[in-house]
Amino acid sequence: MNVYLIVKAKVPKNIVNEFDEWYQKYHLSDAHFSFKSLKAFRCWINENEHHAYYKFKNIDIANNVIKGKSLEKMVKTFDKKWQGQVTRSRELIEIIQEV
């Protein structure tokens, strides 16, 4: 079954618009390309919690991304842009059933 890497970000309210524009124009597509994900999409939860989802065929592929240079590169890009203003976490979820 498919696996999703979920990146959750807490964005200060005063930079939500700037963050949203940057993620839309640059980061989502760059990460999708870099990770070689099957699909990538994002959403907002409440006013300032952003989630990005990257879909992979299986857990092994997703784990390789988590441990690999592509994630390291994207983290550096993110950190350079947001200078510690945005906190984030990552988790993998493995789909076990679909209807």
Enumerate the predicted regions with their spans.
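An amphipathic, aromatic/His-enriched active-site/gating alpha helix that lines ligand/cofactor pockets
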Residues: 32-41, 55-92
